[in-house]
Amino acid sequence: MDSHPSLMGRSITNSNRSSLDLGRPSSSSSSSPSPLTKSISDASSQSLSSILNNPHGGKSGVYGSDASWVGWWSSSTFVAPAEFAPVASTKLPGSELTRSDFHGYVSSISESHGRFEDIRKHTREESCGFDQESHVSGLAACLREVPSLYFKEDFALEDGATFRSACPFSSLNENLALQEKLSQYLDVVELHLVKEISVRSDSFFEAQGQLQDLNVKIVEGCSRIRELKETIRLLDRNLVDSARQIQELSSTRINMLELQRKLRLILYVNQALSALKLLVASADCAGALDITDDLQNLLAGDELTGLYCFRHLRDHVTSSIDSINSILTSEFMRISIHDTGEIDVLILSAANIRGSISSNGNTGEEVKLEEEDTSTLCDRLLPLVIGLLRTAKFPSILRMYRDTLTSEMKNAIKKAVADLLPILVARSLESDFSHGERSVDDGGGLSLASKLRTLSSEAFVNLLTAIFKIVQAHLVRASEVKKAIEWILCNIDGHYAADSVAAAIAVGAVAAETAQEIGFQGGSLVSSPLGKATSKAPPLQGKSSDASSLMNMSRNFRADVLRENTEAVFAACEVTHGRWAKLLGVRALLHPKLKLQEFMSIYDLTQEFITSTEKIGGRLGSSIRGTLQSQAKAFVDSQHESRMTKLKAVLDQETWDEIDVPEEFQSIISSLFASQRLISGKVDDADLNSYHSNRLPLNGSLTSGSGDQNSELRNEKSESSEGSVVSDAQVKPTVSPESLERSKAGVSSATNNQSNQKAHGKSNLFYQGVGYHMVNCGLILLKMLSEYIDMNNSLPALSSEIVLRVVEVLRFFNTRTCQLVLGAGAMQVSGLKSIKAKHLALASQVIDFTYTIIPETRRILFSKVPETRKPLLSVEIDKVAQDFRIHRDEIYTKLVQIMRERLLAHLHGLPKVVEGWNRPPDTNKQTKEFAWPLTREVGYLHRVLSETLHEADVQAIFRQVISIIHTQTSQTLTNLEISSTEAKKRLKLHVELILKCIRSLPSDNANQSDIPNWGQLDEFFAEHFREEEAGEAE
């Protein structure tokens, strides 16, 4: 109402003269603001050209040609606009435009123009509505004629700027005109005010009449209210007062009864507190818990609300429950743990008196409580468990019990070590002094670890045995406590207190759940007795649709207690495992150097300890098992290293001479391979293929014929192993290992072997019915294999490692033997002058024996090896066995090669011998030039091999030797040029002697009328000498 007149007034002031000149009525200028008027108020944001170029401009409105656009920029101060004549438009020639020129423009703005027309139509309809209301707002319309300056809120002529705007200093005539204009403004305002008042006078008087009618009605309503109040007062006095008095008396009676109940409750609580103190002082925990249940039930409700005298009741109950928990906890700890102290004293006393508990690692009878003691333990623990369950403190008490139990175990072990160690150290030193090993030292200045290291293995086993018994006593007690708690909680055998236990579990479950919900992290629990559990039942049922929620909480609470109960025993077992492992770790450097029996006594005792504790604890002890496994592996590695060193030294000192086999080693074969049928040293003569009747009286050795022969043999032995392989490849097709093995079955050694056995005792080592001649290193290897088998049986967990070590030992033995014998290394390390056929034969016997026992050794070792490791280990053992077989065949090939070289040496000198046969015959030297040395060496080789090798091996070797003699001799004799008869006779004698020697050699080759060892030399003899014999006979 205030803003419109100033705006309209400014508009009227600026366009007043133009409106009067154009003769427009004042009503048109007083109409409501049109969109054009709104655009005037925002003239600063409009384009001036768009206003002046409005196509709808005419002689009406502000867009008339005589209207100035200066009014659009008018301010509150009236400024007379300047009058400008319209610009005359001049048409230029050729600027005539037609409608068709605007078709493109019209088509482009047709859509926008349509929207514009719709908007203008809507605006026109709104303008018509404003015109209908214009006569109602006449005052606002007339005020437009007065400048807006006079309607400002801060209008004051005292203000210089306002005065200068309203009354500018000018001439006298202008001042008179200004006074006339101001009077005119005042008249206009007064006139329209009167009009407005007259227009609104009817409504004023109508409203005044309505107010008078309202006043009359209010007076009537007040009178009616006074009448109603009087009526109500009379009704109260006559009808309600007596009933109200009765109600007040009844209320007083109820209040008095409630007061009496409160007083009795106060009396009960006071007496309960007194009784609670007495029960706690007398350690009657069950009765005290009943009272705390009632008191906490009262505290959980609102009966004691507002009683200032019981403001500390909750604290009293809390302290009482703490006291009850302390009593129950101490009694539980005393029954569960401290009763084992007497057993420790008895065990230590017995150990001190006897000095050794059990030297073989046997801990004696298993510690076990009697049935009566177990029943008594359950009866003693039952009230304590029920009480701790009711207070919901049993899980935390069991955790405390676990910590206390582990601490007691540590202290018991520490005390046992402290008491027994000085005694055992002194006895160990005395024992060492009595054996002259070292001087006596009391060990007073040594540390505990040093004292443990000074103990002998037997003393250390005694110490471990004492600790085992003490630990077993504690763990058995803990196990019985665990079983008793399980018996109580799980209602085993339906014991008499099952209902009480179930109620206590329910109370404890609710208490634990409540404590968890309200955020208790420790301290006393004061909000969950049996009464409260009963009162809490409706909310619990509200949380779950049935009683399953309470059952689930009870089940979970019981599970928590049982878990903590199990964890306590397992933690005690873990502590004992750690202490035991620490004791073993102190002596970790000593145990690998022990003997097998000493180490196994510690190992077996530890295994028994682990088994016993794991049985009690119910879980595997990974830490102590790892410690024991690492020490066992270190023991195996140390034993293997020492045996490898010993085996290398034995091989380097080996002279490759045959030795008698002590009964100890035959017993090793009998005990290790008992499943095989062993034969004794007796040999049936009928089963032997003897050739002693045809043997020549040969003397000397194979390598003692001449210096050239010895040098040749040494050169052969000093060749590398590659030469052996080559020669083996050349001869191996004629010597089949399979045929050798088939020929060995059921065959014993030669007759000379039997005679040596009678003279010197048992000279052969028998296995599977076959006797083997042995040297020192072979027996040492057998002893080592038996020790590895013992380790394998004693340490089955390391069976795979032991098998690998056995493979390494066998491979080293085979390689080193090949270097010493075939490679002639023994001539440097052992001082041998030469490698004789006897050495080769004995080496082959040792290699053959080892190769023969490998399958049975593998079977025994693999009995402990896991199935997953067997394929890989089988491949390794098969490779080693193959190496042994190849080595044996190379030795046989070397023996054949030696005989071949000796034959070629004799044949090489035969032409010179033939040249001397033209001289007169000398009967004493007829055969000593060629045949006699050759047959002598062949006979020596036959004798040596027959005494050492098996008959099948001898036959296989001499089959090749005979073949070589036949081939080489016949070829050489064929190429000889013999011109005289005497030379032919001598040659015949030599050939007959060689054939006689060949006939006496063992061989499985028989041809042409069953003549033994028939060959090319026989054919040569028949071809050259049988015809002559036939001619002479004729």
Curated annotation (Swiss-Prot):
Key words of the record: Chloroplast, Coiled coil, Golgi apparatus, Membrane, Plastid, Protein transport, Transit peptide, Transport
UniProt membrane topology term: Peripheral membrane protein
InterPro entries: Vps54 (IPR039745), Vps54_C (IPR012501)
Tissues where this protein is expressed: Present in pollen. Mostly expressed in roots and flower buds, and, at lower levels, in vegetative tissues and mature flowers.
Regions of compositional bias (Low complexity) in chain numbering: 18-42
Disrupted-gene phenotype: Lethal when homozygous. In hemizygous plants, male-specific transmission defect.
Coiled-coil features, chain-numbered ranges: 224-264
GO cellular component: chloroplast; cytosol; GARP complex; Golgi membrane
GO biological process assignments: protein transport; retrograde transport, endosome to Golgi
Cellular compartments annotated: Golgi apparatus membrane; Golgi apparatus, trans-Golgi network membrane; Plastid, Chloroplast
Transit sequence range: 1-87
Family: Belongs to the VPS54 family.
Role noted for this protein: Acts as a component of the GARP complex that is involved in retrograde transport from early and late endosomes to the trans-Golgi network (TGN). The GARP complex facilitates tethering as well as SNARE complex assembly at the Golgi. Probably involved in pollen tube elongation and other polar growth.
Subunit structure: Component of the Golgi-associated retrograde protein (GARP) complex, composed by VPS52, VPS53 and VPS54. Interacts directly with VPS53.
Official protein name in the record: Vacuolar protein sorting-associated protein 54, chloroplastic
Origin organism lineage: Eukaryota, Viridiplantae, Streptophyta, Embryophyta, Tracheophyta
